[in-house]
Curated annotation (Swiss-Prot):
Record localization: Cell inner membrane
Broad class of the protein's primary localization: membrane
Record's protein name: Putative membrane protein insertion efficiency factor
Known role: Could be involved in insertion of integral membrane proteins into the membrane.
HAMAP family per the UniProt record, alphabetical: UPF0161_YidD (MF_00386)
Signal peptide: none
Entry membrane topology: Peripheral membrane protein
Keyword set includes Protein biosynthesis: no
Protein species of origin: Cupriavidus pinatubonensis (strain JMP 134 / LMG 1197)
Coiled-coil region(s): none
UniProt similarity note: Belongs to the UPF0161 family.
GO cellular component: plasma membrane
UniProt cross-references to InterPro entries, sorted A to Z: Membr_insert_effic_factor_YidD
Length: 98
């Protein structure tokens, strides 16, 4: 599924994007954001992140620099830790109180 989404994004960048012009208010562009989100977070979560980004990209927003949040950023904020090569999702770690 991940490969299919990446292929569709590439087709969009090559075939459609040049004709539509540059309209994205963010950097990286929404299509680049979608590509990075799918690569870093997988097909399902990456697609959801890309859809949320597209909803934020409208004429009434200021735009600017909006990178894809990395796995290490999310884990530090949520307290959930997972190695990318692990065959499971994030695991909540509860540390004993001192």
């Amino acid at each position: 599924m991940k490969r299919i989404l990446l292929a569709l994004l590439r087709i969009y960048k090559i075939a459609l994007s040049p004709y539509l012009g540059s309209r994205c208010r963010f950097w990286p562009t929404c299509s680049d954001y979608a590509r990075e989100a799918v690569i870093q977070h997988g097909a399902a979560r990456g697609s959801w992140m890309a859809a949320c980004r597209l909803c934020r990209c409208h004429p009434f927003t200021q735009g600017g620099y909006d990178p894809v949040p990395g796995v290490e950023t999310e884990t530090a904020q949520t307290g959930k830790f997972a190695h990318p090569a692990a065959g499971h999702g994030p695991v909540t770690v509860r540390l004993p109180r001192p």
